[in-house]
């Protein structure tokens, strides 16, 4: 059986932490920022984690991560 391939788009967007969780960046921070408050923009700089329900899907996309 051939090797499985990682989904390259997902591989660029997620990193695995030491505990095995998947770390991600927040969305909605690239443009149309004038109407967003400084507090909102500051919170968008922080990272987030993939939810438990989505982790199973991500394991299929990233078998070697």
Curated annotation (Swiss-Prot):
Question: What HAMAP family does its record include?
Answer: Ribosomal_bL35 (MF_00514)
Q: Which family does it belong to?
A: Belongs to the bacterial ribosomal protein bL35 family.
Start and end residues of each stretch annotated as Disordered: 1-25
Recorded hits in SUPFAM superfamilies, A to Z, give: L35p-like
| GO BP terms in the entry | translation
Q: Which UniProt keywords apply?
A: Ribonucleoprotein, Ribosomal protein
Q: Which gene encodes it?
A: rpmI
Q: A Gene Ontology MF term for this entry?
A: structural constituent of ribosome
What are the record's GO terms for cellular component? cytosolic large ribosomal subunit
The name under which this protein is listed is Large ribosomal subunit protein bL35
Q: Which organism is it from?
A: Clostridium botulinum (strain Eklund 17B / Type B)
């Amino acid at each position: 059986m051939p090797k499985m391939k990682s989904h390259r788009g997902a591989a660029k967007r997620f990193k695995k932490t030491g505990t095995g969780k998947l770390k991600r960046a927040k969305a909605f921070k690239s443009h149309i920022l004038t109407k967003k408050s400084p507090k909102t923009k500051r919170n968008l700089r922080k990272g987030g984690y993939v939810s438990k329900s989505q982790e199973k899907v991500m394991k299929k996309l990233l078998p070697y991560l």
